[in-house]
Amino acid sequence: MKNVTRLVGYLTATFFFSSLGANAAGKMDSQNILSGKLLKTTSIHIHPFSTSEADLGNPKFRDTANAMAKSAPHLLATDIVESLRSSGFTSVTLDESEGMIPADTLNVTGRFTRLDPGSQNLRVWIGFGAGESKVCISGEVTDSSGNKLADFADCRNGLGWGSSGPQADKGADILGERLAGFLIDWADS
């Protein structure tokens, strides 16, 4: 019995630690540079991503999804701005920024295509990925004339346990880091 308990503990720990990093780092699901060179001195404005057409998942959990729809755009935008600034971009703004936005600014716009809180009950009682949340985005980078320079899309699955709200917030943070990573790689290429 002692060995069975150890084995179950080992398998649980292995599953837990391997899923913590699942899908967290790395490239976005889709990222395409259509034209242009991005410099770290280029002015970039991050617009809050729209949630108006997002799939909010099961209607039973709509109240949680609506709360996610209110917080996710700001979390995503601020995370992108913070990541870009810390990597050396010198002129990155968002709607809350003070001052004028330069006329030749690139715009990062997009939308949440899915904000599904999943089922907290399934995560608590079943675990192992049951009831996981999912956050998906898509968008584009355009120049000041509206010409598309790049497009992207990405999804982030929750870890499969715990409360829906923090999972969605973490999903938005990770998507923000991955989108910023795409822009950083573009500037470094």
Residue ranges and their predicted role:
Residues 9-19:
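Bacterial N-terminal signal peptides
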